Amino acid sequence: MLPLRSPHVRDNRGVITDAERAELFRRAHAAPKVHGRPDVVFHYSEDGTIKRFTPHVPPSNPSHPPAVWAIDAERAPLYWFPRRCPRISVWANDGDQQARLSELFQTEASRICAAETIWLDEMRRAHIYQYRFDASQFAPWAGADGEYISGDVIQPDHVDVIDDLLGMHAAAEVELRFTPRLGRLMDEMLASGLPFSFVRIRDARR
């Protein structure tokens, strides 16, 4: 893994302290669940000015009814990237899967995320906004675990700025890899039998 600097997350007061950052990370990414569902869900954006979220049809799924989309804490690391950055991830949900992940990918982490090397400089410079919502306003989406939808206009409870994307992965103990092309690692993830997710792959280098 690359040597990473300490993550910085800030709100409208400016850069916050390490203790405040740790509390934000604990609150946001180890969110408690009620009856198997999270208390809070999240949306990540490069736009920090969104006051309310209006249902829309996602370009990647034009047959889906208009909805506001959010994710739980387990899915969050998939979105600690610049929006257009192709990225892939594989992870373990239990002890058996962890043993397989460790064997196949030579890691001690429970999740691996990977992106193309050409995105490393942008990862260092970029910042994104984390919008937090009350999960009771959403319903689980049947298409994927950890994703939630609402047909209503939703106002976020809070928004934070994440200005160290590399540091967020490090703080969450996510192994972050960079490779010139994702194809071979994608094939290994597909063949692993483990949970995986690919995002913005249509923009990946061929």
Question: Residue locations for each model-derived region?
Answer:
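Short, surface-exposed beta-edge/turn micro-motifs
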Residues: 37-40, 64-68, 74, 126-128
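Short N-terminal edge-element motif at the start of the domain
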Residues: 13-63
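Small-side-chain structural scaffolding
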Residues: 44-45, 70, 77, 151
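Short, flexible beta-strand-to-coil junctions
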Residues: 43-49, 72, 133-137
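Conserved NAD+-utilizing ADP-ribose enzyme module
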Residues: 2-31, 35, 81-206
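Extended catalytic/binding region for NAD+/ADP-ribose chemistry, centered on the ART fold
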Residues: 62-86
